[in-house]
Amino acid sequence: MRMSLIHKKSDAMLNYVKTVLTRVSFDARLFEKELRKAIKMLIEEEVAELKRWCYVTFADQQHQVILNRCFVVA
């Protein structure tokens, strides 16, 4: 029961981060700032999922540079 609750909170946080990144994606600086915050806040498995999602969702050149810079340490 407890693990299920933790997993739900974890999924909710990851979904929240995805929503934030989508909404700020128009501004490169803000996008990078929010992505760095998310990487620090999420657990390792969530960061891996976020990384996969980001590279699929933000495939344009501008975001690729930011993703490569942020995920090099993640």
Language-model features and meaning:
Residues 2-33:
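N-terminal acidic leader/helix
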Residues 36-43:
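Amphipathic alpha-helical segments that form the core helices of the histone-fold
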